Structure formats: structure tokens, C-alpha cells
Amino acid sequence: MRGKQLLYGFCAAHGVGHRRTGKWIVAQTRAQREALERIERLCSGELGVPVRWVGDGEVRRAGEGVRAEEGALESPTTGIVDAHGLMVALQGLFEDAGGVVALNSPVTAITPLGGGGGGGGGCDASSSSSPSPKGSAGWELAVRDAATGETSTITAETIINAAGLGAADVHNMIVPPERRTRLHYAKGNYFSYAAPLPRVSRLIYPAPEPGAGGLGTHLTLDLGGRMRFGPDVEWVESPEDLAVNGARMADAVAEIQKYLPGVDASCLAPDYAGIRPKLSPGGAVGTGKGFNDFIIRMEDGYAGWVNLLGIESPGLTSSLAIGEEVERLLYGSVTPS
């Protein structure tokens, strides 16, 4: 909620394209309706998220061809954003503040300076009886220029591991072997839609299925009103496996037609794919067990290091609020925006 609030304000202030579309989460069975009722109780109670019930009759009267036999839960404040425009705006503010964006510059080694408090990593233990945490004297990073192969060294007071799909690799450069981790990669295939009808004006999500590993193949919109469907969940070994798997389109069509029966399957085409970094393997997610939320924390035994692991959807919506939390962890307070 905090992320959504900040994002709407930021986009309005900095001219980033966005639109409040609203969202329906649709139920076709009584079991799905009961699942949405649990979500509604959580939203209306503990979370304070505005939602309302939309009956099947209201769904049909909207005239957009959406099917919701057991009704829909509406989130009226959900919206869409120009993700690239958002990144460009943030980059501009970062550079205006003196920051440098160094693309194609992989980090190859990280050494915490000072301390010897048992965190592991690349420096010798202190002889002090009460050693300070590793990183208490800063950090040293080796960075390779992908174009020339040359390696340079950067020192910093703090580091924030926000490397996304590469965040586990960065984490593992610092910690001892017994504290290493890995990410599990869920590719999401998206499919574009070229037909003029049906034309839907809001986001449509199927009711969540326990252990599905994602939110289902939903209907999303771009700022021009064009519809896309996705993402599905395809477990892959490499975070670079971004080829759209057209063989999965038949399964996607079957899922889409449950809530949009009038969709013309011949007008769907493979569009693009993205990778979600999961903290739990496919088997754990598939059984509904072993779920892990985002990791945003200072690591025990280290100073000046904030770790961000498993930041997938809704990481974009949460991004500005995550920034606030990182600032609070490092400095104890948040600078007013």
C-alpha cells in the first residue's frame, strides 16, 4: 500500500505515464469465491486496502465479455505504469544527485573491510575481544568492464544488494559457504492480442490457486489500451532464458477462456517473457509449502550491507517503499520526499 501511494505521487510529480485502471479478481466456482472472501477480509480488516464485491450481473452489464460466475473482487485503486519511463526518471534523479550508472560492469568480488564479527567474507578476524562487524570500515568491490575486461576497485561505506536475478550471486560473494543461498527462476510468458474484440478496460485476474507459483495468466493492459495475457509459470534453470515458449500458448488460451470466453485464440501471439526470482523451488511452491516473501534486511555479523533477495512481483509497485525501508535500515530514519 505504501509503495502504491508513493508510486502514484512520484509519477504525477515527474511526468511518468500511468493510469488507474482498477482490477477484477474473478471467481468461477464456490471454492474460488471462498478464497476471494478470505482475501476481502484481509484487505478490509488488517491491511486497509479498498476493495468491493462485484456481482455476476454487474460484470455482465459492463458489456466487456468477462465471465465471473461467482462474482469478482474489485480493487479500484490498482493501476498501470510506464515501467521504462519510471526507470528513466529514477536514473535522472540519481545522476542529478551525483550518482553514476555503470552498465555492463559486473561485480566479481566483494570484501568487507574492518571487523571480525563472524560474518564470514574476505578479511581476517580481528584480535579484539569484542570485534566490530565485518564492513564496519567500509567495503571493497572489484568491478570488471565487460567491454575491455579490465577490473577496477571501488570502495564504499555501504552496499545495497539490489541485483535482482543476480542478487544471490552477490550475496554468495560475501558470506561463508554455510550461509549461501540460491534463487529459483520462474519464467513468465506473455501473449499479445490483435483482435478489436473483446475489449476490456481493466485488469482481470483469475482467483488465485494455492501453490500455483504465480497469480495466474491474467489480462493486463498497456497505456495505449492494448491487451496482453500472462504471465504463466515455466520453471527454468537460467535467468537468461528469455525466449517466449510458444508451445505454452494452448494452455494459456484454456486459462484465458475461463474468464474471457470470447477471446479469439487465432489472434494471440507470443510476445515477450520475463523471469521472476523465487526464494523457494518449484516443488515447494507447487505443494503450497515453503513460500518465502521478499527478503529486505541487514545481514547478521555485517555492517553497512542491506540485502534484497527474491524481489519479484509486486516489486515494481513496492520499489519506492522498499527504498524507504533500505534507508531506515542503514540510517535509522527516512528522508522526507
Go through each PLM region and give its residues.
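A general structural signal for well-ordered alpha-helical segments in protein cores
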Residues: 4-7, 33-39, 56, 87, ...
